[in-house]
Amino acid sequence: MPVYPREGKIIQIHSYKHNGTIHRIWQETVVLKGTPSYVIGGNNKTLVMEADGRTWVTREPAICFFHAKHWFNIIAMIREDGVYYYCNLSSPFVWDEEALKYIDYDLDIKVFPDMTYMLLDEDEYERHRREMHYPDVIDRILKNNVQKLIGWIKERKGPFAPEFIDKWYGVFQAYQT
């Protein structure tokens, strides 16, 4: 059994909180590339279900990047005025044939088309760190990964490289025809 989904497979993405409760489910994402190290997916107007049962639909095409070793995932949203990124500080992904899964650790970085960025939800992170008893080692890992992610943004590395989005959005569009 592979530890990653195969290309072309339509999968769900499940986000959990540290205490094991479901946080959010994305219903349909097509796998554009699956390896033991990373998964790249694409979706557009996919149904999302929140933990409380509310649902909404994504507004634009997105390319998603999940890594098996880094404590973050990256969603590139393709909009009329450019590519916006939403980066979740999270556990590395796991794949169990049901869904691609990760633990959401509250901290987020929003990146604008001009590559300026904002660290978000620090208050929520501190509150959940106390309430859910995040171990100190997790706190250190996450703070180190915030710095790693900022480095990637500044260097335009990985998903932040323009050619990355161009390539994978093209692959995603081919699946849509």
UniProtKB/Swiss-Prot annotation:
Cofactor(s) of this protein: Mg(2+)
Keywords, comma-separated and alphabetical: Hydrolase, Magnesium, Metal-binding
Enzymatic class: hydrolase
UniProt-recorded name of the protein: Nucleoside triphosphate/diphosphate phosphatase
Protein family according to the UniProt entry: Belongs to the Ntdp family.
Binding site for Mg(2+) 2: D106, D108, D121, E124
Catalytic activity: a ribonucleoside 5'-triphosphate + H2O = a ribonucleoside 5'-diphosphate + phosphate + H(+); a ribonucleoside 5'-diphosphate + H2O = a ribonucleoside 5'-phosphate + phosphate + H(+)
Superkingdom per UniProt: Bacteria
InterPro entries: DUF402, FomD-like_sf, Ntdp-like, SA1684
GO molecular-function term, one example from the UniProt record: magnesium ion binding
EC numbers on record: 3.6.1.15, 3.6.1.6
Role of this protein: Has nucleoside phosphatase activity towards nucleoside triphosphates and nucleoside diphosphates.
HAMAP family documented for this protein: Ntdp
Range of residues in the leader sequence: none
Catalytic site positions: R24 (proton donor)
Residues bound to Mg(2+) 1: N88, D104, D108
